[in-house]
């Protein structure tokens, strides 16, 4: 096993990551970094975090053998890490609990968040209600339309939802607005970023709170199959569910890590969100990474049937894993993801989020060419209730 200790002291993963923000945010980031570096080694903080994961979220989440599907495909065995069974229905809550506990220790009574699919917004609103905090969630107006049920859920939980009408009206625009709010209300506000992007310490902090996913798998897989899997597959938008399951496996060189980006309507159409496949190195939301850009270096509008993958950048650690060759990245189109969504419902009785359906589609694509003793572990990062309207619309139905 190779040791792995990135990022460095300045928050860099090789040439990626770092801190590229306005001077007005430097004090807040320094304060956050100091608080996090203290809490991450504080046994009482770790105990409280683990207690909440067990009793509030319902962890550990199980690993599950998709046996009927594996048998039907006739190749490798597909296993799911069932993050869809968490309280709030996705992996997002792991990170939100960690950051909310940190906010409480820092004496910040107000939390803000950006959200795409709405899952991070729901998870933030949920933990804000749990700890009695004020909560404001920024969401692109296009995503508000796509994810109406999650918007209502956030409001039920006591959050204020602010629709953002600028740019493509999606996740990147919501992130911009959240940053503006944070600058304005820095004294009493904690910004809970939902993915492994943003300026240091966010990429490593979000990753650390999400690694519970992979840590559990390291224990669970030997219990059920006697060893670790051959492949670990996860969807990548910003990349937090993928980093959560990848990171503990990085030292295990015989385990191949495969991230799955949104190829949208097809890579050749330009209507996709595959930053690692088609982006160039640039700076977005405070860190250096692969960014979807046009010929003038402006951030390009992205497309995916899945709101949570519809982001023009990617976490800097994924950029590093790609360049170093430790992880590979593939693209799955809208149509392939929708087919996997329907098959998963009918064959396994599990309705995955459209984000997770991209990872499942990649596993299904790989399986027939592999021998039956090979094992693919897929991070089923969330459940698909939130995507009912999108899926029905694509099938020409009105709910």
From Swiss-Prot:
Q: Give residue numbers for the modification (N6-(pyridoxal phosphate)lysine).
A: 92
Where is the secretion signal located?
A: none
Q: Gene3D superfamilies, alphabetically?
A: 3.40.50.1100
Amino-acid biosynthesis as a keyword of this entry, yes or no, is yes
Q: Work out whether the entry's keyword set contains Amino-acid biosynthesis.
A: yes
Keywords, sorted A to Z: Amino-acid biosynthesis, Aromatic amino acid biosynthesis, Lyase, Pyridoxal phosphate, Tryptophan biosynthesis
Which pathway does it operate in? Amino-acid biosynthesis; L-tryptophan biosynthesis; L-tryptophan from chorismate: step 5/5
Q: Which InterPro entries match?
A: Trp_synth_b_CS, Trp_synth_beta, Trp_synth_beta/beta-like, TrpB-like_PALP, TrpB-like_PALP_sf
Q: List the disulfide bonds.
A: none
Q: Which cofactor does it need?
A: pyridoxal 5'-phosphate
Q: Name one GO molecular function term.
A: tryptophan synthase activity
Identify the PROSITE patterns for this entry.
Answer: TRP_SYNTHASE_BETA
As its record notes, the protein acts as a catalyst of: (1S,2R)-1-C-(indol-3-yl)glycerol 3-phosphate + L-serine = D-glyceraldehyde 3-phosphate + L-tryptophan + H2O
Question: EC number(s)?
Answer: 4.2.1.20
| GO annotations of cellular component type | cytoplasm
Catalytic class of the enzyme: lyase
Q: Which SUPFAM superfamilies match?
A: Tryptophan synthase beta subunit-like PLP-dependent enzymes
Q: Which family does it belong to?
A: Belongs to the TrpB family.
Give the protein's function: The beta subunit is responsible for the synthesis of L-tryptophan from indole and L-serine.
Q: How does it assemble?
A: Tetramer of two alpha and two beta chains.
Listed name of the protein = Tryptophan synthase beta chain
Report the source organism. Bordetella pertussis (strain Tohama I / ATCC BAA-589 / NCTC 13251)
The record's gene field reads trpB
